[in-house]
Amino acid sequence: MQLRNYLTETPQYHFYKEQHRIQTYEYVNSKIKQYHNLGNVKIDMSIHRALHMMDSFVDPSDPDTSSSNSVHAYQTAERIRKQYPDDKEMQVCGLIHDLGKVLYIFGEPSSLVVGDTYVVGCKFPQSIVYYDTMKDNADFINPLYSTECGIYTPNCGIENLTLSFGHDEYLYQVLQYNQGKHRITDKFQQIIRFHSFYPWHTGKSYTHLMKPGDEVIMRNVINFNNFDLYSKEDTEFVITTEIREYYKNLLDEYFPEILKW
């Protein structure tokens, strides 16, 4: 099974064409401001409820699966459990990594919920999927944003970059806002924040903006991505009662309280 095979004139192509058009530096910052510390959008919801909401969500940017996102969540977690049976936190990370896609309940379009992420505020690298469509982005010809570093300084660190907005950043903000209500450590919060940052962790772009220590984050993300991406090859996967019960108990352990979203 060939994964991440992006062809033109497909639903994925038209999705990215729209995402690349609207996600300018200015617009992305307006969304980050809206959702920073969850802004005014604060609802009470358990992690179980958020996972259940993925039962009816299919990622329109993904050419590799037409399954609901909840199936992919359990697939990823189970593949991790087979290789790391004692690493409970990594299993939980596999299960929850896409739960930021609940953004759709706030009326956000798919172009602000799913898809690969990339840096705004500097030159767009050709490692971005459907790179040619980046020419529709107003920042493409903006002299302030079209140099290698743009508004950033060399080696400023990936945590100081502004990435296109979507479910990664939103779930990261949820976890940050709810510190003390869960047991997810910084290592796995970073994996969640950067797991869709394919131009960086797979395309090896933006290395001039990395600071010492960022290579550790990259290694962690790449390791996680092996489970996130390749779990989709298991087309016969079935969520059994045992699987559901195992992860229910695991989520209760790592998320003992209701979260603000």
What are these regions (language model features)?
Residues 240, 244-261:
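C-terminal helix/juxtamembrane-tail motif
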Residues 27-30, 49, 53, 187, ...:
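Exposed alpha-helical structural elements
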Residues 35-71, 150-158:
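Active-site flanking loop/helix segments enriched in acidic
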Residues 21, 40-43, 47, 214, ...:
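Intrinsic-disorder-associated interaction segments
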